[in-house]
Swiss-Prot record:
<protein>
    <recommendedName>
        <fullName>Kelch repeat and BTB domain-containing protein 1</fullName>
    </recommendedName>
</protein>
<dbReference type="InterPro" id="IPR011705">
    <property type="entry name" value="BACK"/>
</dbReference>
<keyword id="KW-0677">Repeat</keyword>
<comment type="subunit">
    <text>Interacts (via BTB domain) with host CUL3.</text>
</comment>
<dbReference type="InterPro" id="IPR024182">
    <property type="entry name" value="Vaccinia_A55R"/>
</dbReference>
<feature type="domain" description="BTB">
    <location>
        <begin position="21"/>
        <end position="88"/>
    </location>
</feature>
<keyword id="KW-0945">Host-virus interaction</keyword>
<dbReference type="Pfam" id="PF00651">
    <property type="entry name" value="BTB"/>
</dbReference>
<keyword id="KW-1130">Modulation of host ubiquitin pathway by virus</keyword>
<keyword id="KW-0833">Ubl conjugation pathway</keyword>
<feature type="domain" description="BACK">
    <location>
        <begin position="123"/>
        <end position="219"/>
    </location>
</feature>
<dbReference type="InterPro" id="IPR011333">
    <property type="entry name" value="SKP1/BTB/POZ_sf"/>
</dbReference>
<feature type="repeat" description="Kelch 2">
    <location>
        <begin position="298"/>
        <end position="346"/>
    </location>
</feature>
<dbReference type="GO" id="GO:0030430">
    <property type="term" value="C:host cell cytoplasm"/>
</dbReference>
<dbReference type="Pfam" id="PF01344">
    <property type="entry name" value="Kelch_1"/>
</dbReference>
<feature type="repeat" description="Kelch 5">
    <location>
        <begin position="442"/>
        <end position="492"/>
    </location>
</feature>
<feature type="repeat" description="Kelch 1">
    <location>
        <begin position="252"/>
        <end position="297"/>
    </location>
</feature>
Amino acid sequence: MNSSSKLIAVINGFRNSGRFCDINIVINDERINAHKLILSGASEYFSILFSNNFIDSNEYEVNLSHLDYQSVNDLIDYIYGIPLSLTNDNVKYILSTADFLQIGSAITECENYILKNLCSKNCIDFYIYADKYNNKKIESASFNTILQNILRLINDENFKYLTEESMIKILSDDMLNIKNEDFAPLILIKWLESTQQPCTVELLKCLRISLLSPQVIKSLYSHRLVSSIYECITFLNNIAFLDESFPRYHSIELISIGISNSRDKISINCYNHKKNTWEMISSRRYRCSFAVAVLDNIIYMMGGYDQSPYRSSKVIAYNTCTNSWIYDIPELKYPRSNCGGLADDEYIYCIGGIRDQDSSLTSSIDKWKPSKPYWQKYAKMREPKCDMGVAMLNGLIYVIGGIVKGDTCTDALESLSEDGWMKHQRLPIKMSNMSTIVHDGKIYISGGYNNSSVVNVISNLVLSYNSIYDEWTKLSSLNIPRINPALWSTHNKLYVGGGISDDVRTNTSETYDKEKDCWTLDNGHVLPRNYIMYKCEPIKHKYPLEKTQYTNDFLKYLESFIGS
């Protein structure tokens, strides 16, 4: 025991024996002896009370009957060196009393106890408490715990004590931990039923309506606490005019496809939002220079090189729902590499590339519909090319730049529709090997090579194309020039990552700030070392709802998927 601890122990002994005590704390019929000087040193409340003539200097009593006796007694013991004995039952009372008496160290100790012991069983209780007493630190932490555990909490006895204002805040949050937006109406209905409160338009506006299945929308229509409110039915009748919604963070998985340095195996990585790290979920033997397309949560990899020196016609796939590889897919019509991959609602497309027979460029575009036994010829580009950007926008296939005859880049931009090819505004510079994505109704490209003659200059350019005005816009450049990077979009933000920079594989990622028009190195999406990212795709979680007929207990059926 150090000297200060010994001193406070002696003073506490004086208090217990009544020596030198000059104040009595009165709470109803209970009295607590203390010393004004000691209380003033620990409590801002007592310091002001005793030093600013709020009470007569000769007054021997302070009445605090509006406070909890046990909490005040525990805190005065704490001031005199006796540790707080905190439990889930008493910590709220002690914290609110410490806050009233302005005992800073006790407040911190109580807050730390709550934060350490916060869980799904007590988060609603602590959230309601923190909201009442305006404790932002606990309110924020308990709110985040509610978001994380929301599907457990819909059957919690305290769920009904959340206010409509709190439910609006919960249902509006991007971090609401649901893997499919259909669970959001389930959460809403559970709260309405537990409170027997009629629905409001403000609550319905919190749902991402454009992402809901028809069955769940019908469940909303038919529920008595919704259908009985005219304004709610009017709102639901006009959902076709609402803007498209962005998925919540937990309703998508960010999946990357690339080559790791472990003998250059194909690596499938999933981004862990909690840990802010990429985790490999599967891998298979070597392949490179292949095309990638995603349809119905299945990642298709077409052509490229495998372990032989020859190009491949094989197509393999990875099912992100079952975490399994698929090998029984019809082969391409001929071996090719450095081709482009796309998908619409029905077909997978393999575009251009280099043929195996004589390493010549090809202009052919083939397509395949899953469940069909073979690939079909679909169209031909105006000229053979490889390593071009490809994008699907408004039902049209766009082919951007690429390498043409003579190993030079091209600046051509063309689109393919049922009426054939159409030329558009050329790129500001000849480019190839760039990443491409459709975001917010525009085509974005980044990185790659750019040169008017020999293909050898690594680019950090970022461009966007507006198909309505047929014009290119140059955006802020990347911090790191990259060949074959991955460009992706989640939650209305653009990211670029991976690729090769100065012949070195880079594991860095960058995030685009649209308002400031700048790219920032992103510490949260750092890739594994020596990893070439071919593509990064947000995968939406799906449940077999589209195959299920609507019934009156459809929401109960949906509830059976919680935890799966």
